[in-house]
Swiss-Prot record:
Pathway(s): Metabolic intermediate biosynthesis; acetyl-CoA biosynthesis; acetyl-CoA from acetate: step 1/2
Subcellular location: Cytoplasm
Catalytic function, reaction form: acetate + ATP = acetyl phosphate + ADP
This protein's GO CC annotations: cytoplasm
Record-annotated site: Transition state stabilizer: H178, R239
Functional summary from the UniProt entry: Catalyzes the formation of acetyl phosphate from acetate and ATP. Can also catalyze the reverse reaction.
Recorded family membership: Belongs to the acetokinase family.
This protein's name: Acetate kinase
Matching Gene3D superfamilies: 3.30.420.40
Enzyme Commission no: 2.7.2.1
InterPro entries associated with the record: Ac/propionate_kinase, Aliphatic_acid_kin_short-chain, Aliphatic_acid_kinase_CS, ATPase_NBD
Length: 395
């Protein structure tokens, strides 16, 4: 039995889960918020009871020390020697990393070198890695990359039709994200279908505040909707998804915004929030549609129809599909979104049951038993994938 901690470090936050392996039992989980800001918040669950503390947490090293201190204080572990491995989520692995890696100083340096590909995320992930290394220098640590699963995409999927030297010199290509989630749910779908993943064509819809669709053939990602950054693809909570690139100088000219300001608008003020004008939270949008809010209705239709189109194009790409998977916050919980996305897909053999679709947050088949294409809701579990990779690489 080993104890593995899975870490997801953001710029001012640190999410954690402690697993007992190989049983994959969650011993505790929690969140440190507002790191480096006033009134930091530390939350941990102890015997299914949430304990919260507010205190100043100046940096990630302090957050890590606090977390480890609480694990022993609450008797979750006897001492720090019980921690056998640490798994870190790293958003961008570039072309360099097509699998998770054991973290050496050299590997940390290589991750730092590709940080320009994900300036919002990778630096924070690295801060988390270094904070743990400082406090637990002898515990093996593994980096698990969001982009790694998509490194199996063929050239025709990942190349942009730009001058080829941009790819050679600057690494400009599609990378794709949510890879750990897409990998988990497609492997789980194969188990639920009782078929080897090698013979399956799956479309995975990871729908949260960020959303991406992946075409997974024989267990390998062959295409995905996000691109060089997580801004591409379908419309999201606050992100625009795909737009005509010529709009950027046009918007700059019309509004007087700089390129960075337009990019900020595309990342933080667009998507569901941009169209509805009042919220990026899908639950608010759905409630507003019930009250007859037309802009909310439009936002919901745009969101669902873009996903619907990706499903059609990926089915064509794989010459068919065996199952469609819904996961992440919206995919797992929004009956309405699934209904709108699936509507009209009968022509390709998707027959779903409105009664079975009335499910939230748990594994379920929502297609009729006779449906040639199965539709499955699978709650994602990126943390357990991280823990499994630590066991695979460090033990």
């Amino acid at each position: 039995m080993s104890k593995i901690i899975a870490i997801n470090a953001g710029s001012s936050s640190l999410k954690f889960q402690l697993f007992e392996m190989p049983s994959e039992k969650v011993l505790t989980k929690g969140l440190v918020e507002r790191i480096g800001l006033d009134n930091g918040i530390f939350t941990i669950s102890v015997n299914d009871e949430k304990k919260t503390e507010t205190t100043d947490i100046p940096d990630h090293s302090v957050a890590v020390k606090m977390l480890l201190d609480k694990l022993t204080k609450f008797g979750i572990i006897k001492d720090l020697n019980e921690i056998d491995g640490i798994g870190h989520r790293v958003v961008h692995g570039g072309e360099k990393f097509s699998d998770s890696v054991l973290l050496t100083d050299e590997m940390i340096h290589e991750i730092e070198e590709i940080s320009e590909l994900a300036p919002l995320h990778n630096p924070a992930n690295i801060v988390g890695i270094k904070a743990f290394k400082e406090v637990l220098p002898n515990v093996p640590a593994v980096a698990v990359f969001d982009t790694a699963f998509h490194q199996t995409m063929p050239e025709q999927s990942y190349l942009y039709s730009l001058p080829y030297e941009y790819y050679e010199k600057f690494g400009i290509r599609k990378y794709g994200f949510h890879g750990t989630s897409h990998k988990y749910v497609t492997e789980r779908a194969a188990e639920l279908l009782g078929r080897p993943i090698e013979e399956l064509r799956l479309i995975s819809c990871h729908l949260g505040n960020g959303a991406s669709i992946a075409a997974v053939e024989g267990g390998k990602s062959i295409d995905t909707s996000m691109g060089f950054t997580p801004l591409a693809g379908v419309a999201m909570g606050t992100r625009s998804g795909n737009i005509d690139p010529a709009l950027i100088p046009f918007i700059m000219e019309k509004t007087g915004q700089t390129a960075d300001e337009v990019l900020n608008t595309l990342n933080k003020k667009s998507g569901l929030l941009g169209i509805s004008g009042f919220s990026s939270d899908l639950r608010d949008i759905v409630e507003a549609t019930k009250e007859g809010n037309e802009r909310a209705e439009t936002a919901l239709e745009v969101f669902a129809s873009r996903i619907h189109k990706y499903i059609g194009s990926y089915a064509a790409r794989m010459s068919g599909v065996d199952a469609i998977i819904f996961t992440a916050g919206i995919g797992e919980n929004s009956v309405e979104v699934r209904e709108r996305v699936l509507h009209g897909l009968e022509f390709m053999g998707v027959y779903w049951d409105p009664a079975l679709n009335n499910v939230r947050g748990k594994e379920a088949f929502i297609s009729y038993p006779h449906s040639p294409v199965k539709v499955i809701v699978i709650p994602t579990n990126e943390e357990v994938m991280i823990a499994r990779d630590v066991v695979r690489l460090a033990h």
